[in-house]
Design a protein with these regions (language model features):
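Gly/Pro-rich cap/lid or specificity-loop segments adjacent to the active site
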Residues: 1-84, 91, 95-107, 112-118
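Alpha/beta-hydrolase-fold enzymes
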Residues: 96, 102-182
């Protein structure tokens, strides 16, 4: 995406709408938003209404399109969870979007992917600083989040990809060469 014919999506010719997810702190109410019902100014934290679904996000995006006067989407593009949103666009509003570009996504999670997601969630919840979701924003559960992200990064790659990226064989050769040069 860029300005010019060499880009797959030329921003001179296309109107791009990029919408953040519901409950993300970057543009909508989220668990870190101040809860108006709490007199002490504390955030929603664990009291934030859940769950929020892919379909909920698409419905809000459609309302935004209506508000902007957009009558049709030429293309819905998304990576990972964004590809699930694009698929939901096609399922919920089939006459509203013409084309889909799905990057690293799926229409349905496998049992393995659901299990990985739960393990990641539990690693955050097991962090002593999580405190049932009522953690101190100045001292969040970083260790649990770091563990969750490590698990996620591994789950995004096939074993061969990890082997190529970290290439333990090369490291063993370096260690052997270092040991023989002493």
């Amino acid at each position: 995406m860029g300005d010019g014919d060499e880009f797959a999506i030329d921003v001179k010719d296309e109107f791009i709408v990029c919408v953040n997810y519901l409950a993300s702190p970057y543009g909508s109410s989220s668990p870190v938003t101040s809860d108006p019902k709490k007199v002490d100014g504390k955030t929603y934290a664990a009291d934030f209404p859940t769950p929020i679904t892919i379909r909920d996000n698409v419905r809000v995006q459609r309302k935004l399109c209506d508000r902007l006067g957009i009558k049709h989407l030429k293309m819905a593009i998304g990576g990972s969870m964004g590809s699930m949103l694009a698929l939901e666009w096609a399922a919920t509003y089939p006459d509203f979007v013409t084309e889909l570009v799905l990057i690293a996504g799926c229409g349905r999670h496998t049992d393995w992917a659901i299990g990985m997601g739960e393990a990641q969630r539990f690693s955050i919840m097991a962090d002593a600083k999580f405190k049932g979701g009522e953690y101190d924003p100045a001292d969040p559960p970083r260790a649990g989040l770091a563990t969750s992200r490590m698990m996620a990064m591994l789950s995004y790659r096939a074993p061969k990809s990890v082997d190529q990226r970290f290439n333990r064989d090369v490291m063993e050769e370096v260690e052997e060469a270092s040991a023989t040069s002493k």
